[in-house]
Amino acid sequence: MSARCCAGQLACCCGSAGCSLCCGCCPKFRQSRTTRFMYLFYFILVIALCCVMMTPSVMKQVKDHIPFFEEFCKKTQAGGDACENLVGYSAVYRVCFGMACFFALFCLLTLKVNNSKSCRAYIHNGFWFFKLLLLGAMCSGAFFIPDQETFLKVWRYVGAGGSFLFICIQLLLIVQFAHKWNKNWTAGTVRNKLWYASLSLVTLIMYSVAVGGLALMAVFYTQWDDCMDNKILLGVHGGLCVLISLVAISPCVQNRQPHSGLLQSGLISCYVTYLTFSALTSKPEKKVLDEHGKNVTICAPDFGQDLHRDENMVTWLGTLLLIVCISYSCLTSTTRSSSDALQSRYGAPELEVARCCFCFGPDGEDTEEQQNVKKGPRVIYDEKKGTVYSYSYFHFVFFLASLYVMMTLTSWFHYENATIKTFFSGWSVFWVKMASCWMCVLLYLQTLVAPLCCPSRQFSV
């Protein structure tokens, strides 16, 4: 069994075979999923490397424990004479440039691939050892790019544009997810009236979360005679939640879109509340002198100040959350259903089957593979009849995610003094989250108002 396992893993690393787990008690995996998880693993490796590079103490530790390191830098000129370019925001820019080029290359390589038996599909699904070497070579080669100042300046604007597009894709998916959720559960009310209770309960919970969240932020992030900017922010966002709720149930919208309702607006309101909270926690601390002449932080909760004192815990928890969120966004936005949602392609309402877990396919899907699961190999080749997701679009999303990670880790446009302890706070981070919040509201309103403005055009929502 061990020899067979080693042969299988060797074929996975150096050939086109799919990857799997060796132990007999481990579940079998579909090739389409293992491929995406392997690319995600490479992506997380590079993020971890970037986080290390943003840690100020790393360079000192490396110089102290590796005697030939400084001499190596002088000879290769890869990190400057004193290796100063191997850490900090410039190093993250270079490493993320290499990772972005890696995914851009595979995006072009897999264009128009619809058959998993093609040569390019074999390259996409296998040869993991050689792809790891290629990724390492691209990230390392970025340190030898001439005219570093021009490169960093141009790449910064490319990163900002790509990050904006990545955020737009995620916001579009959230809006379309809300519409799909309501449409699926509403379809269930035709056969079972209990779906009305489910719709009402979930809607009530989401509005309770949104109202409660805004109320708690008003208590902890404002003061009676200060924090006017926070008060205005909470008032505006609360007003936006009320606006989208009224528009969603207005008669003119209901005539054109009978499936529009409070479930979608409740979900968007919850997301607006989350982004508002995230933005407020990202604002730089505001300090004033009290009556005793001591600096005190205002417009922030006391427990938040105590938490910020434990910088290591906040930093690493935030880093872990960042990795989880980006990984989830990349994987969920590259499925076939998500691609259809971005193009507003859905099944006919009469064909909708209401399910609690409506994100996944209906029961009985892929029955052929399930019947052979006990007899087949450790990998289920689920793309025999065609690809189950767009290879090129998958790599394009990871290309944009690479740019988003680069801008996030370097505090967007306040990159000079950025470290791993500061990339979750700052005015750039605050305004990016605010812009994301407003853009989400506008995208949702667009899906409601567009059919009214263009009555002759068919909108599938």
UniProtKB/Swiss-Prot annotation:
This is Serine incorporator 5. Residues 1-36, 112-125, 179-200, 253-260, 334-392, 444-461 are extracellular. Glycans are attached at residues 114, 184. The gene is Serinc5. One of its GO terms (molecular function) is acetyltransferase activator activity. Residues 58-90, 147-157, 222-231, 282-312, 414-422 are cytoplasmic. GO terms for biological process: antiviral innate immune response; myelination; phosphatidylserine metabolic process; phospholipid biosynthetic process; plasma membrane phospholipid scrambling. It is found in: Cell membrane. It comes from the Eukaryota.
